[in-house]
């Protein structure tokens, strides 16, 4: 396997929203990007940020939006309008190959790179249909929907 680049992209999920700009600034020299976890309370049981928070982030770093939502195709427009660098959606939220391909194409046409994410228990083979079309694969090492969870080491063999 080729040596692929490694990117450090911390999530703002656990950030103090009252000091969000300060917290973003504190990592700008050490991070390769900022990840914004968008949760809808349906795909995952929690709610989090949306486009208004992304709009408020002032940074030189690329913003990576991780959509933990049902029907991600209905949400990409609001983030593409903000010129985010990457949009990642969950394979489990879009199970049909044609729908996945259409979503990846729409993200790329909108000027962002496209990523696909897998929950810890989802086999890597679940994305064989589109893995060569995406720019990144996010292997969740916690159950999506909550911050501050313990790392699930069973995910490591999927990465190798």
Where does each model-flagged region fall?
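Short loop/edge segments at beta-strand edges and connector loops
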Residues: 116-118
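Conserved N-terminal beta1-alpha1 strand-loop-helix module at the mouth
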Residues: 1-88, 93-109, 113-114, 125-134, ...
């Amino acid at each position: 396997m080729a040596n692929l680049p490694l990117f450090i992209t911390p999530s703002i999920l656990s950030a103090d929203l009252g000091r969000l700009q300060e917290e973003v600034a504190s990592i700008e020299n050490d991070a390769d990007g900022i990840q914004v976890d968008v949760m809808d309370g349906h795909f995952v049981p929690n709610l989090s940020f949306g486009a208004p928070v992304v709009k408020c982030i002032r940074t030189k770093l690329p913003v990576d939006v991780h959509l933990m939502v049902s029907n991600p195709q209905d949400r990409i427009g609001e983030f593409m309008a903000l010129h985010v660098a990457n949009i990642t959606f969950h394979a489990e939220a879009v199970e049909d190959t044609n729908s996945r391909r259409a979503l990846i194409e729409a993200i790329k046409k909108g000027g962002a790179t496209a990523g696909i994410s897998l929950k810890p228990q989802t086999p890597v083979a679940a994305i064989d249909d589109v893995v060569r079309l995406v720019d990144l694969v996010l292997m969740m090492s916690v159950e999506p929907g909550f911050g501050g969870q313990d790392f699930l080491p069973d995910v490591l063999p999927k990465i190798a």
